[in-house]
Amino acid sequence: MCEMKKNYFYSILLPLVIIPTGGLLILGTCYLFYLFIYNFVEFWFFPTNPTAVPADMIRRVYALALLIFYLALLRTKISDIIQSTVLVGPIGIFFTTTILAFYEKPVMAIAVTVVIVAVGIFLLYKYKKPWIYYYALVTTLLISIVLAWPEA
């Protein structure tokens, strides 16, 4: 009986807490690093005209770089719970970038986000990833919508 409770704790309860908590910390770190990059570009390349900073381009390149980093991380032997927790950062930035790219066209933002989620679910299924990756994907989607969706 004790072994069953221990297994339940490590396989279900722990991921339910670690993924959103650790994921939020990683997502926050990703946002702070984006802010650092943005401020660096503004300070060194656009000191007299801060509104000329190509924020969209910086955000898109950064999101792509994070996705490439995450794909490299997937090839390591790091545990699934750490990989799924780290997934929140790159995917969160990617969702936010997508939503902001279609900020004035909410229907298009929804359509592209649904396509990204569908591709993500397909890839997770194809590579037989455990449920914690799906949980991380859905958690990230909800967080990104709250953070990036246009206010009414």
Spans of features found by a protein language model:
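Short, Lys/Arg-rich, polar N-terminal cytosolic tail immediately upstream
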Residues: M1-F9
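Alpha-helical transmembrane segments
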Residues: S11-L27, G89-G92, T140
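Hydrophobic transmembrane helix segments
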Residues: P20-L67, V86
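Juxtamembrane "helix-exit" motif on the non-cytosolic side of transmembrane helices
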Residues: C30-F45, F95-E104, V146-A152
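Membrane-interfacial loop-to-transmembrane alpha-helix junctions, especially the N-terminal start
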Residues: K77-G89, W131-Y135
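Terminal transmembrane helical module of multi-pass membrane proteins
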Residues: I121-A152
